[in-house]
């Protein structure tokens, strides 16, 4: 074959290469992909991971992501609930039903058992709460079961202490967190190195917001406890919050219960979790409500975060979630 002369080569039409268009992920797809990568990374890297599951919206979404990460196989690690004994019945019913559906092992770490064993002392008085006592119960359960990685549903938009915490949060032999001694996380590279007795807290939802959670609930049809939607309940006002009338709370002088239409933005110990007045009965209603809100759910409804300006960070340093 005769060689192509230079002037002939210049006259040849340019070759047009066509490549298929890259699929553009929605922001929810991108968040889901990141979280599933983190969950799979932990399952591959650690010997005994566990996922905290309280039945709240964040842990419900996190468990759905774990389900997707390993489908069609089962979730390969247990879930754990640190049970204060002061729970909302609707949340416990949901927790048990969801665990049964997935066929995963449920580890219940009981604060009451810690009290009975003398590990912690229960607070007294009308403002008493078991919220802070959970730290000892959690750390004891981690030690008892030799868990080396603990998934949590914390998000950075919730509270300023969580905003500066890494996805992989190193905890020392005592379960303590030192915010000044955190490991760098470049792109999707995570350092899970630890010694025996130490463990890593892992937060796959770090980059999600409350609105992202609710949009994902709508998009993926995630079931949640009924108290996340508007319902009539007896409540009373304390320190600007609406607390549910409960056998775990002693009313103070001047506090009068009344029935109101409310819902809960976050779920925790009944003694310190407030409700908000709301008529949002559907996921779409809640999304519209959250989109218009300018206060995070913890800032608006959690009495335990109002103890001091550094209330959450102080608890996390001790080993809290």
Spell out what each predicted region is:
Residues 13-321:
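Nucleotide-activated chemistry modules centered on ATP-dependent adenylation/adenylyltransferase
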């Amino acid at each position: 074959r005769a060689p192509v002369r230079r002037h002939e080569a210049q006259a040849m039409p340019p070759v047009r290469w066509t490549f298929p268009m890259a699929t553009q992920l929605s922001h929810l797809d991108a968040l889901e992909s990141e979280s599933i990568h983190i969950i799979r990374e932990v399952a591959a890297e650690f010997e005994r991971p566990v996922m905290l599951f309280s039945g709240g919206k964040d842990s419900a979404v996190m468990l759905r992501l774990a389900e997707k990460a390993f489908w069609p196989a089962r979730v390969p690690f247990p879930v754990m609930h640190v049970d204060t004994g002061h729970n909302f019945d609707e949340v416990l019913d949901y927790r048990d039903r969801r665990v049964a559906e997935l066929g995963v092992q449920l580890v219940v770490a009981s604060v009451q058992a810690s009290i009975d064993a003398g590990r912690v002392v229960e607070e007294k008085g009308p403002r008493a709460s078991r919220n802070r006592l959970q730290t000892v119960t959690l750390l004891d359960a981690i030690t008892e079961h030799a868990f080396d990685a603990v998934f949590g549903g914390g998000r950075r938009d919730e509270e300023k202490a969580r905003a500066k915490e890494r996805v992989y949060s190193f905890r020392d032999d005592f379960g303590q967190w030192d915010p000044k001694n955190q490991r760098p996380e470049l792109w999707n590279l995570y350092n899970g190195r630890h010694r025996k007795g130490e463990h890593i807290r892992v937060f796959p939802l770090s980059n999600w917001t409350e609105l992202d959670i609710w949009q994902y609930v709508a998009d993926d049809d995630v079931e949640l406890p009924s108290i996340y939607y508007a319902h009539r309940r007896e409540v009373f006002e304390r320190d600007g919050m609406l607390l549910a009338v409960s056998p775990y709370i002693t009313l103070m002088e001047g506090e009068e219960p009344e029935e109101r239409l409310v819902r809960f933005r976050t779920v925790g110990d009944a003694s310190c979790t407030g409700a908000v007045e709301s008529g949002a009965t559907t996921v779409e209603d809640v999304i519209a409500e959250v989109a218009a809100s300018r206060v995070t759910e913890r800032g608006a409804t959690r009495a335990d975060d109002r103890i001091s300006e550094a209330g959450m960070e102080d608890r996390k340093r001790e080993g809290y979630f």
